[in-house]
Every structure is written in structure tokens, then in C-alpha cells.
Amino acid sequence: MSNEVETSTTNGQPDQQAAPKAPSKKEKKKGSEKTDEYLLARFKGDGVKYKAKLIGIDDVPDARGDKMSQDSMMKLKGMAAAGRSQGQHKQRIWVNISLSGIKIIDEKTGVIEHEHPVNKISFIARDVTDNRAFGYVCGGEGQHQFFAIKTGQQAEPLVVDLKDLFQVIYNVKKKEEDKKKVEEANKAEENGSEALMTLDDQANKLKLGVDQMDLFGDMSTPPDLNSPTESKDILLVDLNSEIDTNQNSLRENPFLTNGVTSCSLPRPKPQASFLPENAFSANLNFFPTPNPDPFRDDPFAQPDQSAPSSFDSLTSPDQKKASLSSSSTPQSKGPLNGDTDYFGQQFDQLSNRTGKPEAQGGPWPYPSSQTQQAVRTQNGVSEREQNGFHIKSSPNPFVGSPPKGLSVPNGVKQDLESSVQSSAHDSIAIIPPPQSTKPGRGRRTAKSSANDLLASDIFASEPPGQMSPTGQPAVPQSNFLDLFKGNAPAPVGPLVGLGTVPVTPPQAGPWTPVVYSPSTTVVPGAIISGQPPSFRQPLVFGTTPAVQVWNQSPSFATPASPPPPTVWCPTTSVAPNAWSSTSPLGNPFQSNNIFPPPTMSTQSSPQPMMSSVLATPPQPPPRNGPLKDIPSDAFTGLDPLGDKEVKEVKEMFKDFQLRQPPLVPSRKGETPPSGTSSAFSSYFNNKVGIPQEHVDHDDFDANQLLNKINEPPKPAPRQGVLLGTKSADNSLENPFSKGFSSSNPSVVSQPASSDPHRSPFGNPFA
């Protein structure tokens, strides 16, 4: 490579000159009198600068580690190789090493990409497989990053400079500490000042040397850095061992004094009993948050539960003695230790916390369980449970302060269950957070009514129900359950019996003149009071019968509000009486229904309009044919999608074939009473004698019009129309259907085309 190593001093030589010059620098470092001065001069200011390329940056979990660094290096090299295959190149950088730390500067722009002070660099490793690559770990706690760098030449000089940098900084700090030590020695010494100074020195050594020692003591480098630096390495290793001993002492002191070993091992039990508060604080080191579920991790059940028990032993030494008398283990582990008897007993208590201590199964006695509760609930909850186990437990403190129950779960879970049991009948049904799935069985059985009450809260009618007296919420629950059974008459009784309870407004609301008004006084009638529940459920669940009912209502827009309920009640049950009741309503509106506005939908109009038009034929006195057809039309009206049109067309054209000679005179005489206007009579008179071709063409138009009106196209009407075209009298239907199509093409053409044919042809031959 033609890349050169550049420094602020005379370091701009190729590899051949840099190789012999490196030992000279190391020889200078041997002399302790020159090392610090030379290194300070070397790293002062901008320091040393090396040309390199940035392989990549990777987040790493730890501050140091050979295996971690190697894995990260291989990962970044693989990513760089993949990028190179796509035409990407590594970023060219300058690595600047100075007293301020390591700076990564972009070669082109000169911008400082990354800057890491010395105290943030925790590990430096040279790649074993590539002598031109190295990496270092930097960053704060939890934010460690591994920077992989490919140097232009050998990476060894750069790594040596980094070691020199850390050594210089360490020596400078050490000298400063020595000066402080001398100044402190010259001053008047107080009692224990020397011990404090030694502790400070050790702490300073930790601060200064930990990074340095862990940096190079854990370095993943081969023994290339050998002869000149062995003495220094030995010194660093000695300091490292000293630091390790100090760290171990600092680590073991909290272990021994805080009694954490009592949590993990049963050996130092008396220490935990003498220092229970330290045991609890040390236990938090391993388990930062108290475990709400003591059975979540069985292997750690002992330390997890021993800590609260030892913490509770602060406030109740007498009950600690009682628990000691009831168990053969010390109080440090309490009744919650690995003893299977107390473990099983606690399990029974957790699973049977419904206020029935006698239901605890197994050979575990009741008094020992009571002592257990006393031991575990020393934080103020035992005063509630020791007397009568659940008698004094009031639900209001639990409802007011749920976090207190979560802070120390071993004691409050029992009070939680007792308060839930005592407040099961209250209107405020608060389900506590699922601390454990096992006591949930008793909770579910005890709060079945409360769960139903919460389930009914989904509807807006329940909050007013709570405003009623305390005994009332049980009644709306059964009413809501009855409403969902689909029985319309079932909820009528309870809804009427509720009186002022605002449960009925959403049901009767849709049938009031104002659709969204929730007042119950709008529908007090006997006819409507029986119907709102049956119509409420289709509206809520979006079923089609209720929608069709409201779609058909525009045809009866003029009648007053009381008649529609009587009309709509049979229509939902689809009884024959419905159409008989619609006939008196359809008669007065015959003249209006023949030419309604075209905005009416064809789906909503055919049934009421057919009923109204079918009611018109009885006006002429000799209508025997229509009387025979009325019951058949009524039954076909019940099924609008049936074969009604097929029957009408067949009968109509059957009459055509029989009555061909007398059609014209009978039609002229009977068109006025059939309910048609003068425009239709003139239209029929004009159409008499039209050639057969036009008649056939009109037949085809009428057939298309019938097919448009009837959603399911029937082949029978088409054949009937084709047979009717052979007759010369078939022109009666076709012009008539055209007339209706011109005046009202969307709605009335179907019923009007059926009845006028039936009425004029039924008179002569009936």
C-alpha cells in the first residue's frame, strides 16, 4: 500500500522506515525519565494522525471482551464486503490520537465524525487475522459501540500509541495523586485520616487504572507487542491484580454485609437476621423490582420471598419469634424458605383466599398459616387480618390505594382478596390487576355478579342504574340478559316495572316522532309498549326486517302516527292479516299512488302499491274475476319474490286468447271504472287497429319493463307475452304498460299493468 503514517512529529515515513523507528520509540519509553515527557510532547495538541478506513460501527452489549470484539469485527467485515459487491466503498478517515482521546475525521471534508475521550474508551483489540485492522469499544453504560477500523499500514503502531496514551494519562494522574498525598501528609493528621487517604488512593487507582488495565489486559492481540513492553505489561498486570482484589473487596463487602448470600445460600442465616434491612436492599440488586407473583420463577422463589419476610422482621420481632417457634428455620428465610410444608401452605393460602381458612387442604395446620399471614403482612395489613382473618378488612382502603397493594404483594394480596370478598356486593366493582392467576379462581366465583354488572356497563343505561338505590343494580342485570335472548315479550315486563329507570329509552326511542329522543313518556300506549323491545333488537343488531319496515314507510307517509305500529306489527311476523289491514289504507290513496313521484324505490313500493291497486277492482259491481284473484294475490303478496307475476301473466294471456273478438268494445266500456285517467283511455282508443309489427314491438317493450320491475326474471312471462303477441288484442297491454312507463316508469307500471288487464277481461266472461 502507498498509504503513509503521518504524525505531528516526524512520522511521515514508509513501512521500511517506520519499522526501525518504532523500536527506537519503545526504547525511549524504557527510560522512565523520558517516557512521560516524550509522550506528553507526542500527544499534545493535535497528537498523532493515522490514515485509515472506517469498516463500520456496531452496537455491543458489554464494555470489553475478546470474543465480542472478534464477532463484531467479523460482522462488520461481512457487511463491508457485501457493500463492496454493490459498488460501495469504505469511508476514508484520519484517526487522530491525542490527550483528548480518539477523533475520527473525514478525509475529504475534514469534519470530525466521531470523538471519544479517553475515559469513554473501554476496550481496544487488534484483529488476530488481519494485522491492518483493529477496533475499540467506547460509549457510556448501556451504550457501547464497537468501531472497526482498517489502517493504511500496520495497525500495531496505532495500538501502541493508544497504549502509550493511556499510560501517559495514568502516570500524570498518579503524579497528581502523589502530590496530593504529600500535601495531605504535611497537614495535621486527624484520627483515621491515613486510612481515608489509602481508600481514596485505591478509589483513584480504580478510576484511573480500571479502564487501562481492562483495555490491555483483555486485549485480543497476539504476542507481537513483546520485548520492549513486557516490563510495562507486567506492571500493568500487577496493577490489574491489585485492582481486581480491590474490586472483589468492594463487591464482596456488600455481599457479606448485606446478606445477599442468605438469599442464594442458606449459610449466613444469622447475618440476615441481624441485618435484615441490608438483606432487603441487597436483594434488590439481584431482583430490582419486587416480584408480584411468587410462583413465577420457582428456582428463585426462596430469595424472592425471603427478602420481604426479612424486611418485615424489622417491624415485628415478636412475630418473628413466633414464626421461629413454629418453624425450624431461622427468620432470615422465614416460613417462605425451601421447606416444602410452608411452601405448600402458602400455595394453599394463595389459592384459597376467599375467606375460608378451613378449606385449606393437606396436613398443614391452621395456626401456622395464621402466623404466616402475620409474618408476611407486617406493613399495616396484618392489623386488619390478624383479628378474624377477614372481618376487619374494608374495601375502601383497597380501592383508594391499589399501588400500596402492589408494592409489597406478599402481604397485600391476602388483604386484596379479603377486600374483594367483602366488597363483592358493592356497586363499585374493581377487578385488581392480575397479580397471580391462581387466586383468580376464588375471585371469579366470588364476583360473578360484579362481573355481570361490569358486562352491563357496556350500555349507557347502567351508570344511571347505579344512581338508583343499592339494591336495584341486580334487576337491570337480569333484564339485560333477557334482552339478548331474542324474546321480544320477555323484557317488556321488567322494562315496564322499572319505572323511572332509564333502561327503556334506547328501546322505545326509534318509534317516537323524534328518533333520537330518549324520553319514555312518548310511547306509553298499550300497543306501542309491547312493540319497542321487539323492534329495538333488529335496529341494534342491524337485521334487515327492521330496515325494510322503515324503507316501506314512505308509501304511508300521510297517515297519522298511531296507525303505523298496528300496520308494522303484523308485517314483521308476515301474517296474512297485515295485507288485509293495508287494504283500507291503500284505498284512499289509490289516486295518489297511481302517479307517485319517481323517487320512490321499486323495492319498497310493490307490496303496498299492489295491495292498494288490488283493492280497487271491487269498485265496479260485476267484478267476479278479481274477487277470485284477490286471495291468490294476497298470498303471492306475502311472498314478493314468488311466482306472482308468472300467474298473472298466464291468466292474463289466457283471457286474451279466449276473448279476442269482444276485447275492443269491452275495453272501451270499462276503462273508465278501472281507475285509469282520460289520458289512458285516449291512449287505448288511439292504439286500436295498430299493425301487428308495432304491437309486437310494444310487446317486447312491455316484456322488458316487466323484467326490470321483477328482480328475478321469469321465463314464463316471456313465453306468455310471445303467445299474446299473436293475438291482435294484445295491444291493450303493451300501450298500457307504455303509458305507465311514460308517466311512472319506476314504480306503478307493474301493479297497474296487471289489474287493468284483469279487470276489463274479467267482466264479460265472469
Swiss-Prot record:
- Region: Required for interaction with GRB2 and CSK; residue ranges are 661-669
User: Would I find Protein transport among this entry's keywords?
Assistant: yes
Annotated effect of mutating residue 122 to T: Abolishes LDLR endocytosis
Keyword presence, Amino-acid biosynthesis: no
Q: N-acetylserine modification sites?
A: 2
Q: Chief localization class?
A: membrane
Residue window of motif DPF 2: 298-300
**Sufficient for interaction with GRB2: annotated span:** 600-730
Q: What CDD domains does this protein's entry cite?
A: PTB_Dab
Sites of Phosphoserine modification: 2, 193, 323, 326, 328, 401, 727, 759
Role according to the record: Adapter protein that functions as a clathrin-associated sorting protein (CLASP) required for clathrin-mediated endocytosis of selected cargo proteins. Can bind and assemble clathrin, and binds simultaneously to phosphatidylinositol 4,5-bisphosphate (PtdIns(4,5)P2) and cargos containing non-phosphorylated NPXY internalization motifs, such as the LDL receptor, to recruit them to clathrin-coated pits. Can function in clathrin-mediated endocytosis independently of the AP-2 complex.
In Swiss-Prot or TrEMBL terms, this protein is called: Disabled homolog 2
